[in-house]
Amino acid sequence: MTSAAVGRTLIEIDGAGSAIVFVHGLGGTSNSFQMLLGALGGFRCVRPDLPGSGRSPRPFQALTMELFVATIWDVVQKVGGGPTHLVGHSLGTLVCLLLAAQQPEWVKSLTLFGPIAEPSDPARQRLRDRAREARQDGMIGIADAASSGGVSSASSSANALLAPFVRESHMRQDPEGFAQSCEALATAEGADLRFLRCPTLIVTGDEDAVAPPSAAQAIADKVKGAKVKVLEHCGHWTPFERPRDCARLLSEHVRANETA
């Protein structure tokens, strides 16, 4: 593994071969996909921390979805080396969808874990409330809620380290960066899915309250040929909760579409 930077965006690069660029969600970092890398031999796995998250500092301008998309587009061009597989979780799936719609010739495939096409009005308000909480009280309450409510009880029982890992991922976020990321998602508009041309795999949990199976299927219905996999007894943090299943599904998908 090597660390690098594209501008002020810090990235980790593992392996060699065709590029897979991973985009984490709210409260996540490049580490959100660490458990999937073992199944991806023969690929170059590129994992950035989005601006204001993880080790990437906040820029001088406010965080927006447009900035996130531009950041990943910059990474794809400068590190990807050509058409690239995109993988996202939660907020990161919307970044991937937007980029794939804008630059279809650059995207070999999409893999979306816990996808968000566009926040509902109630979700937008919850995101604004979460931003306010981060600024006023820091990350403790948000981290507790994410680690207790974001994962399924079965996943927590099977892996005692899961909830603490999700909690720590949130606790290490810069509160202002997290708040601005929430606001960016709260004002986001969805991608025009008619412009998607790449093979698309959507993976969600049957207990995912953020991206329930019905929402995942609604996205798939608008993307020609998209496939949906629903993992049983799984919440929103799919790569954490079902790493073996997610690694297998991702590996099969990118390998099947490597010549796309």
Residue ranges and their predicted role:
Residues 1-20, 41-44, 80-82, 172, ...:
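Alpha/beta-hydrolase fold catalytic core
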Residues 9-57:
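Conserved HGGG/HGGXW glycine-rich cap/lid loop of the alpha/beta-hydrolase fold
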Residues 67-84:
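Conserved acidic catalytic loop of the alpha/beta-hydrolase fold
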Residues 88, 92, 96:
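Gly/Ala-rich beta-loop-alpha elbow adjacent to hydrolase catalytic centers
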Residues 97-102, 106-141:
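Flexible "cap/lid" loop of the alpha/beta hydrolase fold
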Residues 118-125, 137-195:
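Conserved alpha/beta-hydrolase catalytic His-Asp/Glu region
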Residues 196, 202-204, 208:
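Short beta-strand/loop motif that positions the catalytic acidic residue
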Residues 234-243, 247:
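Catalytic histidine-centered segment of alpha/beta-hydrolase-like enzymes
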